[in-house]
């Protein structure tokens, strides 16, 4: 029963899954989604629903809905039916349909009497309206424009179509889904309308009901049609606005329009009659139309930015027979013919492509300049063009098919009706395909084996390696075309070259011989039915010897003598080069098809015009080029000329003025950028901004353009995100008392930021309007004249005249002196000062500022110097520092501290007067104080007397009162019990004293009257009293009842009362806490005093220690002075600043714990942290790594938890308690399916070269003691050193060394990712990854650290890596010095002080003596595992903590030494030549100690040679540099420029080469320099600048430390001064990224037991590809017990060229006949075969030692990932899929699984 139930349940699940995945359900779902893409067609539908009523209204509704549904149905059918899709999908058809219809509709609704209706009846008119409604809904549904920014929902159906087999069913189901969604939407709209009608609040609106607005409402209802049409028109205009209009766009001038000489016409290329059919890097049809005429200088042969075309001639009937013998005339005649053809072609072009060319150039494509060639390549989107092509021998849809091929194929089909291709059956195609590839494989195998045999025969390597041919266009300098543009390296379908002899030699016989030959390419594949098998056999029959090829190509100038190649070897080379394939010459069948073809050009997709940006035009960098208009929009900027030097001071200027404009040379200019956001973003002029990718403007006022990816990082508006946490933080911050000061500072900062923003806005508004700067500039000048010469003199006159009237002395001289001191300096818009008289250039258009120096303020009187006291003087100096002695003038005549700032408050004229008055009033008060005190004393005496009199009167009055009481008691008569009544009344009245005050008063009066009545009171009066008491009681009861009712109604406390109560409670608690604090504050103060006293006494105790230290230092300095008398040693002494207290701080810092966040937990980080831990601690982690690092906190020991938390690896307190999985299961399964990759353990071990296995046992490694010394290595080093060049770019010209550093860096990346084993063996990996260390050890001599390398957990020897590719940290060099340090256990700073001083005679080592530190590294056993991962940085870090200034960050990256040998005998002026030894050259320090010692004393041979022939040395240097930098744009611009200083040349060289770093100024220095520039510009123009210079230094505007900078400052000095800072740029280097990807996949290839070190087998290998022989000989010398094995190459396949290598590997990898492993697109784990494993299984295979593979590399790691995973270019036969992704493959059709 249970089984039956489970069976039913399983069937149900599978049934449900099938239903969900069925075409109908998916179609319904996607169709339903398309309803949400609301377009303007919904406007018509809604209008028909909302507005129309009655019979006509219902008809309109019906017609609207039918039209709407019909339109949508047509759209769905167009997905399936191709012609309809083409008709509706093309943008020009939609535009042509939309524009006239929109205009018609607009005029129809806006003009009532537009049509003369005449005698039409009402029914006819109504029917016409209904038809119009139907048409509106139908047509607008077809228009493919959307209100929403993306129409993704509508396109989902199109996307899913490619995965469906039953397409028609899918289309119908999606339409039904859309219909359901539409019905639901319309029902919802109807419900909303009903709700509006029924809702009284909306209907009974005051405005609608009032008579005043009834007319407006009716008018609105009548003109609804017009409003709808206006809305519709706006949306359609918005849509059309996204397309650039073909008439008004800005056309850029191509280089062909600039004109040219005869030479230009000779080399110019013409437009091909057919599209470029050899598209390689994703060309488009629009690239065909772009032609470029190559401009050639008279001297040079060909520029770098030339465009080369490889031509293929089919026959030569067009060439005239009667051509003249002259070459130039013949060429011109030839091109005339071509031009005529092009003229006819222009008429053949359809009108549509001219007007509606949606792929025109002025679409927003970026113009990114290429460093290699100036005319840039088009940077376009990749093509997604679907067409059938052969893949794996069968026809499949390729989505990267070249569109030009498919269009050409369709053109052929249309033009030639008889052209049909018989479809061969798929089996035959696949057999052909597999046969061809098998044959290819066999041929490649043969070639490969032949080359390996040649290796065994010890041929030279140059003959064995397969060479790639490059296109060389400068033989002298060996300059090549870049690989991208090289026609020889550009794929199978490139154009083939067949050279003609010169035109005059063409004869009839030549034609007869050559008429049957033609070349085969992809076009022939489309046109011909070729028996491929037969054709492949005929290739080999062709006799290559008959071929003769010219050496020179057609685009070079013709040589005088024709050189022909007849040798067999050269013909073979050219055969390989051009890949010539020809049919049999007897076969004449092919000629008929090609009789009309003349030539086909292969064009590089470049821009046909050379654009410059506006910024380049401003900078004037295109001085060499023809002056041209900028074509690229840059950020708004203006060129502000700061200083013009009309008289040249140096002789150098006279040399430089040749062929250059002297005015431009002698002026200094700054570029002023606009502060507003840059919406241009290097856009080309004429292109549309709205279609710029990755730009979204989503706000009304947006400061910057943002990509939609980063929306979550922008501070959004309130309704976008409600940040509760931020609010909570703000509330807490406000309530905290401690943060009051911080808040105040923050407020100030915010205020300053707001002020700055406001200033920038004002500046931009002035800059944006047309004539604003002219108006502002003229107003400022007027204001300055008014202020200086009218207002201020008037004020002086008025003041002094008033003083004279008040009988005061006038102050004419003082005021006039201050007035003359005020200066009005004209400044640029940025505030750079010029002078009083000189206006900045173009100040009316660019803007002006007027700066007032020492502004004049009117004072009521001037104090004499003697009057001012010492206190006043001090106050004056402090005020001076705070107050700036300058201001800027505004348009309104006010003063501001900064340009466009808020107006400053002037010191008031009347303020000192009021102050003086206050002082005098104070004096008067003090005088009157004595009089007041006397009056006060008298008043007190008088009050005392009055008090005594008062007391006496009161006593007498009381005495009389008592006597009267006694008399009344004697005459008293008892009446009832009046006392009781009285008491009762009093008690009751006390309860409600507030309510019944009147009653109490009456009662008291009654009582008194009763007390004082005589006994002769009548009974009537008593009765009246009793009645009165009763009434009062009744009244009291009523009042009490009312009071109860009131209290019951008010039992609920109000919100205000609650607040009052809570505030009372808070106040009470606060009082309580306050008293407690006061009580306990005494103890706290005591504790503070104790701590202070303790610290004080500790300081006193440490005093003798510090004094001893100082004493030792002083003695040491005296000894140094005594010993080292030389100046250089004296300089070194000055730089030995040591602080030893930092060692104590270091200990404190090390004790601090750092808490890590879980977000930083990556796999590399985890293993990096684990690698820093001591080995003994790994015993704790045994349980952790048992279960693949997947643990929950319940089963882990507390000790392990604590350990993890301390190391910052894991936090168990956090919610997410799972580790990241360190293995990649998906890739594992995929690799398991490739069963041929499975190798046993010993095979894995033997995959590495056995020559270089290093025994890790001490017993097996026997060192030869005679070779341990360094003498032999020193000689080698010295020999190597002699070979080194001594120019600026020497360190840059060593590609082998750089390659080595590259691989070490890549290896580190691999190690950090690749460690997944339990024992954390960081050395796991393939043999390829353990390379390069042997040569590293050989070069850097790190053998002193060899004791620690037997540690099995971390193979740290490999991990020496460089931060940069091209720059070297100084290696550990100083191994020769025989001096040992006395005490090895002393502190590091003591070691640094004991560094040897020898060998540094002529070299400035400003920061650190690396030699001694290197010696320590060699003799230093690493016990601190904190730096276990990077042991080379251990000493660096410790010394850096002690001496923070010693090793700045730049010295961990670069080490500069300056070799300055100034010889004054050689003058610079001869030929403008600077000898190399006089240059302050930038060098990367890479010397041995022996060379260091001899550097200052002995001249090396290389230097001597250079001194003998300085010019030849410089030529060699220039040649070397040009080889590396010939293709860079910067060199092109600067090669004609002579540098004024060495630093400029150094910076230029540095920045061109080291693109991994950017240089930036120190931020403080930047501001200082700008301030100095502003002051310099003013001082240069003044005759007596002393006063202003002193005042600017006082104000801190001009910093004197910058004035001390030398004129010719070298780059190294600028670095050392801290002026320039090196910052690493995060560049994405493709090679490194790929290597990391390969090695992540390589994780799954690692065998479990591969690298476990056992007792029997303890060998590891460290391999260097480049220096194999040298390192083998070295290690054979060093070790006695080595066996010799001959291995020639690390990877034998590297013999082949990369293309052949890839082809060979692919062909071997896939079994073409059996097809066992076929499914490369399905999920990875589908094809895992049970009998093959890669990981963790079949350990018995490890014992098999018979069939071991001797190849030293494995197939998989050397593959490029994209080529193996995708097989893009070769396997799928596609042309544009470089960046092939797995997602794209998975989206479309899969391969069938057999």
Curated annotation (Swiss-Prot):
One of the Pfam families matching this protein, by short name: Ycf1
UniProt-listed GO biological process terms: protein transport
Keyword terms: Chloroplast, Membrane, Plastid, Plastid inner membrane, Protein transport, Transmembrane, Transmembrane helix, Transport
Segments traversing the membrane: 19-39, 68-88, 91-111, 133-153, 176-196, 227-247
PANTHER family cross-referenced by the UniProt entry: PROTEIN TIC 214, PROTEIN TIC 214-RELATED
UniProt family annotation: Belongs to the TIC214 family.
Protein function: Involved in protein precursor import into chloroplasts. May be part of an intermediate translocation complex acting as a protein-conducting channel at the inner envelope.
Assembly, per entry: Part of the Tic complex.
Other comments on record: There is a partial copy of the N-terminus (positions 1-343) of ycf1 in the inverted repeat (BAF49986).
Protein name according to UniProt: Protein TIC 214
